[in-house]
């Protein structure tokens, strides 16, 4: 899996950008060989932008929770639009500030002039309105509070038909070189459209077989280590489910994000987006899936105390299925025998567990594949993890 001619994408960033709408496309594109430059006006390489999670937490409007930071890897002033295949603008409050910034609006307008792909999400459609790009009835969707401004700007509001709730929305709309989404709940499908729009070919080595993955989670699962691979494998056309022993289909699991703040030995834990269980425990059959994935966070510590969870992983191992873990996910795998005599990646938090379970830690590698076991040390290793696990499952993305 790889890229014959490397694609390059620009991501326009700012304070309080939506974390999920930033990290998911960033890591997925990086996993499949796309270069992504993250920039913000007035800031340079190495500077940081605060990211926030936006979710419905029982109030009439979404709640904003500061979660962590993104480190910029390029300079805004050095951007040459001709050198990129697309621009991605996540949602979040920074869009209100930067959509009034002449340099940012001109940048977006230049991408439109070059007919480069412009990917907007949630509230970042403000840039399209500011640049006068919606005139003539261009089809556009966004978070519903944006509807009046899209229509006042000459755009044609598009909404996925037949949905009753916000979280039933899974689709996006593309009109020419403009692509818009309601927000992070739609990322599985919108990433598929994004990859295809960049010229990718997604294929599987197994003809007439839909690859299927089961994510084993619980409360305090790490936000990115469930959301990034879950949406990534949806984008690759896989059947993807999430299950937990103690909750029904449609119920929520709280997620957490670990943010390493200056001067601290360990990261600060913060709440992230809620994640919805997609399948009931009693409806899960090991034979229906090719792989089980145990994300990180503190949920593995919860699951290791539940005999049902331990036995489920053990059944995947016994049946020769693929088993994968991220970060603290090794904690649960250690209790199932999945790590015995296996090479694996490990964070400091699971080194003792891996060793006493008979595993071999590969200190020099952040993501390791050993036969049908794929492990990543931390969430920052998710691009490598996505590449390794998709390759192991016979999936390829070629540009």
From Swiss-Prot:
The keyword GTP-binding belongs to this UniProt entry's keyword annotation: no
Chain ranges of the PfpI endopeptidase domain: 7-199, 211-394
Top-rank taxon, per record: Eukaryota
The keyword Chaperone is assigned to this record: no
Assembly notes: Homotrimer.
Biological role stated in the UniProt entry: May be involved in oxidative stress response.
Designated name of the protein: DJ-1 protein homolog F
């Amino acid at each position: 899996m790889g890229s014959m001619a490397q694609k390059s994408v620009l991501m326009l960033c700012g304070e309080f950008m939506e974390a999920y709408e930033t990290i998911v496309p960033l890591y997925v594109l990086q996993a499949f060989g796309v270069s992504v430059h993250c920039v913000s006006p007035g800031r340079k390489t190495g500077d940081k932008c605060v990211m926030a999670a936006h979710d419905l937490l029982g109030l009439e409007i979404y709640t904003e929770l500061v979660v962590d930071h993104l480190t910029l890897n390029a300079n805004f002033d050095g951007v040459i639009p001709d050198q990129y295949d697309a621009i991605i603008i996540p949602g979040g409050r920074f869009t209100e500030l930067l959509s009034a910034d002449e340099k940012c609006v001109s940048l977006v307008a230049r991408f439109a002039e070059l007919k480069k792909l412009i990917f907007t999400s949630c509230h970042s459609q403000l840039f399209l309105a500011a640049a006068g790009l919606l005139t003539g009835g261009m089809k556009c969707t966004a978070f519903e509070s944006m509807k009046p401004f899209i229509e006042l700007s000459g755009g044609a509001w598009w909404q996925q038909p037949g949905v009753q709730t916000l979280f039933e929305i899974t689709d996006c709309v593309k009109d020419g070189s403009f692509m818009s989404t309601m927000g992070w709940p739609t990322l599985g499908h919108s990433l598929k459209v994004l990859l295809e729009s960049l010229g990718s070919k997604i294929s599987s080595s197994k003809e007439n077989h839909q690859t299927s993955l089961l994510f084993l989670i619980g409360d305090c699962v790490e936000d990115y280590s469930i959301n990034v691979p879950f949406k990534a494998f949806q984008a690759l056309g896989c059947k993807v489910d999430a299950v937990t022993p103690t909750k029904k289909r449609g119920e929520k699991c709280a997620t957490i994000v670990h943010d390493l703040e200056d001067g601290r030995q360990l990261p600060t834990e913060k709440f992230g987006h809620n994640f919805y269980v997609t399948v009931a425990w009693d409806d899960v059959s090991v034979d229906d899936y090719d792989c089980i994935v145990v994300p990180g966070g503190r949920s593995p510590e919860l699951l290791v105390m539940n005999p049902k969870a331990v036995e489920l992983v053990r059944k995947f191992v016994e049946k020769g299925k693929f088993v994968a873990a991220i970060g603290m996910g090794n904690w649960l795998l250690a209790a199932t025998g999945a790590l015995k005599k296996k090479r694996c990646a490990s964070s400091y938090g699971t080194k003792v567990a891996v060793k006493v379970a008979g595993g071999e830690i590969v200190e020099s590698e952040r993501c390791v594949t050993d036969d049908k076991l794929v492990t990543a040390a931390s969430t920052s290793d998710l691009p490598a993890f996505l590449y390794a696990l998709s390759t192991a499952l016979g999936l390829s993305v070629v540009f």
